[in-house]
Amino acid sequence: MDPQNALYYQPRVPTAAPTSGGVPWSRVGEVAILSFVALICFYLLYLWVLRDLILVLKARQGRSTEELIFGGQAVDRSNPIPNIPAPPSQGNPGPFVPGTG
């Protein structure tokens, strides 16, 4: 190589590292973070809105919310608890006196 042409022939230096044939790790990180955020949003939506909406919809089908809380056991409505009136009061019995009655 003569010195006159040395100015035109400079050594070739790569400007960037060659890329490997695959998905870049930054893209994998973005997908993982977005999936995690979406999962948290869905969980909070369930806690604040969807759980109450499910209870309301099931209650409209004829089941009370107490029945929903205790699961799928059917309530026996054929033998309800009777309303027993309170025993009659004897009026004011007065002060307690030991040794009487």
From Swiss-Prot:
Transmembrane parts of this sequence: 30-50
CC annotations in GO: host cell membrane; membrane
Location(s) in or outside the cell: Host membrane
Endpoints of the signal sequence: none
Residues covered by region (Disordered): 75-101
GO biological process, one term: transport of virus in host, cell to cell
Oligomer and partners: Interacts with the capsid protein (CP). Part of a MP-CP-viral DNA complex.
Protein name, as recorded: Movement protein
Organism: Maize streak virus genotype A (isolate Kenya) (MSV)
